[in-house]
């Protein structure tokens, strides 16, 4: 039995149904989303594909919250969706609802493998389903940076997206003959230079800033405060993880893992540069900014098992990060 199966058996539920080759739905505008009405002991979704949150014995989701007078939103990608959690009650939205003294629960607005443009569009398309929104937290940052290394023909103006190869290949098959497709691919390969790390960071920051501007306008209209949280990576938090993390990381790397694709992004220098530029962008827009990495570093021991992979949390990790995030949000409010 592999370490992934032994230490994180819940990950099979995600890889079977929620991975790129799982039962995803192709949708207008956001491209793809989670399975509808999915039921399992690990993850459950509503009729629109949003994951349920648990709070005080009740469950809520974007498409199933008519019983609420108000709510709070945590939006983002797979970390917010809760990849790694062994059940819905262990996601960030659930743990924040349980650990937060306020009455309105947190609703999970996470979209697996979304970039910042998709995150913003998802919210704009579905906010009419929600009751009054008291607060919005956008926890994001990695996917824009990771996708920024793709060629310009995939990134274009609004950012590359995961599974973009399938989309572009399908479009080409309709638009080109076999000969012209072969020629165009040869030309594309000749110009597919990988951007420098500096260019990747600049592109990701500008894309995030533009989408944050849209988030700010939406939240201003709703009179809901907005906070941007830079999501942490395992190697940003600490150079060497807990023993369980190191076993999982090593096993995943043998299969062509995270470090192989995003090695330079894992460095402290990249983290600090990216963090500072995003913080400056938030300051320009008047948006509250939280660097979760440094807050976690100040709160955990070296042997604490926090991550199931380099970007997703264990159950205990979700609870710890939720508590830290609540504390950070409270500190921001006291200072404002």
Q: Residues of each region from the PLM?
A:
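Serine-dependent acyl-ester chemistry module
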Residues: 143-277
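Short catalytic/ligand-binding loop motif for oxyanion handling, primarily in non-cytosolic enzymes
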Residues: 81-84, 115-117, 144-149, 234-240, ...
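Loop/turn elements at helix/coil->beta-strand transitions in domains of secreted/extracellular proteins
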Residues: 102-104, 131-135, 222-227, 285-287
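Residue-level recognition of beta-strand->loop/alpha-helix junctions
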Residues: 108-110, 230, 291-294
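Short, amphipathic alpha-helical "lid/cap" segments that border enzyme active or binding sites
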Residues: 116, 120, 205, 209, ...
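Catalytic His-Asp segment of secreted/periplasmic serine-dependent ester chemistry enzymes
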Residues: 235-332
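N-terminal secretory targeting modules
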Residues: 1-72, 129-132
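Serine-esterase "nucleophile elbow" of acetyl-processing enzymes
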Residues: 50-112, 117-132, 137
């Amino acid at each position: 039995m592999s370490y992934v199966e032994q230490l994180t058996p819940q990950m099979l539920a995600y890889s079977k149904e929620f991975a790129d080759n799982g039962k995803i739905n192709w949708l207008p505008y956001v491209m793809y989303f989670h399975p509808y009405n999915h039921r399992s002991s690990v993850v459950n979704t509503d009729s629109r594909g949003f994951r349920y949150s648990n709070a005080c014995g009740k469950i809520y989701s974007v498409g199933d919250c008519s019983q609420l007078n108000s709510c709070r939103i945590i939006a983002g990608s797979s970390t917010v969706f809760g990849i790694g959690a062994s059940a819905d009650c262990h996601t960030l939205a659930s743990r924040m609802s349980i650990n937060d003294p306020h009455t309105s629960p947190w609703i999970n607005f996470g979209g697996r493998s979304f970039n910042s443009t998709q995150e913003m569009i998802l919210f704009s398309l579905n906010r009419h389903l929600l009751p009054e929104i008291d607060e919005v937290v956008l926890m994001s940052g990695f996917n824009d940076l990771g996708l920024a290394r793709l060629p310009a023909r995939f990134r274009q103006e609004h950012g590359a997206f995961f599974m973009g190869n399938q989309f572009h290949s399908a479009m080409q098959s309709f638009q080109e003959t076999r000969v012209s497709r072969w020629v165009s691919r040869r030309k594309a390969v000749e110009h597919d230079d990988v951007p420098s790390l500096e260019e990747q960071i600049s592109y990701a920051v500008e894309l995030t800033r533009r989408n944050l501007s849209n988030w700010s306008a939406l939240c201003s209209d709703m009179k809901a405060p907005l906070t941007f949280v830079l999501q942490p990576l395992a190697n940003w938090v600490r150079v060497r993880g807990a023993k369980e993390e190191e076993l999982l990381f090593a096993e995943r790397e043998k299969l062509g893992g995270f470090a192989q694709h995003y090695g330079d992004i894992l460095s402290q220098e990249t983290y600090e540069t990216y963090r500072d530029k995003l913080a400056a962008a938030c300051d320009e827009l008047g948006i509250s900014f939280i660097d979760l990495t440094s807050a976690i570093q100040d709160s955990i021991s070296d042997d604490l098992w926090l991550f199931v992979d380099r970007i997703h949390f264990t159950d205990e990790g979700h609870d710890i990060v939720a508590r830290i995030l609540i504390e950070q949000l409270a500190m921001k409010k006291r200072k404002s």
